[in-house]
């Protein structure tokens, strides 16, 4: 049976063999606290390549040490990180899977010793540390850190870069009026609150010519926050800057009640795709091949990001193919059982 899920997808010379993306998920397993890959990471990612993911996106990797969510996060703030990522990429690609990395800065949600940084000195919640409001120089340094990280990602052989602008981390904090109370050029109007992300995208584009994704949280789930209409506008700006795809998640810039259900974020991806005229990735409680196929067939999104289902089933693509009554090639070593 011919399916959309297992059809190739090409962008800027990068072709995915199918539309299944392993979503970036922090593993908090850089045990030496130096941001470097551990043996666990190789097993974790390569097993999903053997399982025939079209694209594997490495978890949020901090562009600076103070940009980690925890001190056991991966990092890409140093040239010392390149060798490990290059080795991982080589081994993943041996199975015909493309690779991406998510560049990130945790902002006020960093759980680290010492000062943490944010657009404004507003803690995430009552239990969280109060961040230091970033100076303009610190903002410029962070933009440079994203650019330097993109250079390292290119040297390490990644096919795609994603900028993490979601889940209440630094870029999301600048975008949302709930976390950004600045009165300078980086706060106030929507255009000013977008300025930091604009500068990050421009800086990355100066050194990166491959596909560029941005992950966003398309709703703050509160009446005083941003909603899908705001993010259609943001996605339009991103498209104008040359961003190729919006990876559409939601929430987490403030504490909020979120009613989840299968595919609960797909409607956001669909509305951004239609409203901004840009390709999108759908993510969030997508757990079956039939569900993924429906999203693609009805043109609600272009790629399917699979998160926790990949943790439960490293061979999710095979499972999905069987469900859709089609077949896919597996590793040659497994031919006798595939």
From Swiss-Prot:
Question: Which residues are FMN-binding?
Answer: 23-26, 60, 102, 215, 307-308
Catalytic class of the enzyme: oxidoreductase
Q: What is this protein called?
A: NADPH dehydrogenase
Q: Which family does it belong to?
A: Belongs to the NADH:flavin oxidoreductase/NADH oxidase family. NamA subfamily.
Q: What does this protein do?
A: Catalyzes the reduction of the double bond of an array of alpha,beta-unsaturated aldehydes and ketones. It also reduces the nitro group of nitroester and nitroaromatic compounds. It could have a role in detoxification processes.
Q: Name one matching Pfam family.
A: Oxidored_FMN
GO terms for biological process, alphabetical = response to toxic substance
- Describe the subunit structure: Homotetramer.
Where do the annotations place substrate binding?
28, 164-167
Reaction catalysed? A + NADPH + H(+) = AH2 + NADP(+)
> Which cysteine pairs are joined by S-S bonds?
none
**EC number per UniProt:** 1.6.99.1
Q: Does the keyword NADP apply?
A: yes
Keyword line: Detoxification, Flavoprotein, FMN, NADP, Oxidoreductase
Provide the GO MF annotations for this entry.
Answer: FMN binding; NADP binding; NADPH dehydrogenase activity
Co-factor(s): FMN
């Amino acid at each position: 049976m011919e399916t959309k899920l297992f059809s190739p997808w090409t962008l800027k010379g990068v072709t995915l063999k199918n539309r299944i993306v392993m979503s970036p998920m922090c593993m908090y397993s850089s045990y030496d606290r130096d941001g470097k890959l551990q043996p666990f990471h190789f097993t974790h990612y390569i097993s999903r390549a053997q399982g025939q993911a079209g694209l594997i996106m490495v978890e949020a990797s901090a562009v600076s040490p103070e940009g980690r969510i925890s001190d056991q996060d991966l990092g890409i703030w140093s040239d010392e990180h390149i060798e490990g990522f290059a080795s991982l990429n080589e081994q993943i690609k041996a199975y015909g899977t493309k690779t991406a990395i998510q560049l990130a800065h945790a902002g006020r949600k960093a759980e680290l010793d010492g000062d943490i940084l944010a657009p404004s000195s507003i803690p995430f919640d009552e239990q969280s540390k109060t961040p230091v409001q970033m100076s303009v120089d610190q903002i410029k340094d962070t933009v440079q850190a994203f650019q330097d990280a993109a250079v390292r990602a290119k040297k390490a052989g990644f096919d795609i870069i994603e900028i993490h602008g979601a889940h209440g981390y630094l870029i999301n904090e600048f975008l949302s009026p709930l976390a950004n109370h600045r009165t300078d050029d980086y706060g106030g109007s929507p255009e000013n609150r977008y300025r930091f992300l604009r500068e990050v995208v421009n800086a990355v584009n100066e050194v990166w010519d491959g596909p560029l994704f941005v992950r966003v949280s398309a709703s703050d789930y509160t009446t005083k926050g941003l909603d899908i209409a705001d993010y259609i506008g943001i996605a339009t700006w991103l498209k104008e800057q040359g961003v190729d795809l919006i990876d559409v998640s939601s929430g987490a810039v403030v504490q909020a009640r979120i009613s989840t259900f299968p595919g609960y974020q797909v409607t956001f991806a669909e509305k951004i795709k239609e409203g901004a005229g840009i390709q999108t990735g759908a993510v969030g409680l997508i757990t079956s091949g039939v569900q993924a196929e429906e999203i693609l067939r009805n043109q609600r999104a272009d790629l399917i990001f699979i998160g926790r289902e990949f943790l439960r089933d490293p061979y999710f693509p095979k499972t999905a193919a069987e469900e859709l009554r089609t077949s896919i090639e597996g590793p040659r070593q497994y031919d006798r059982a595939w």
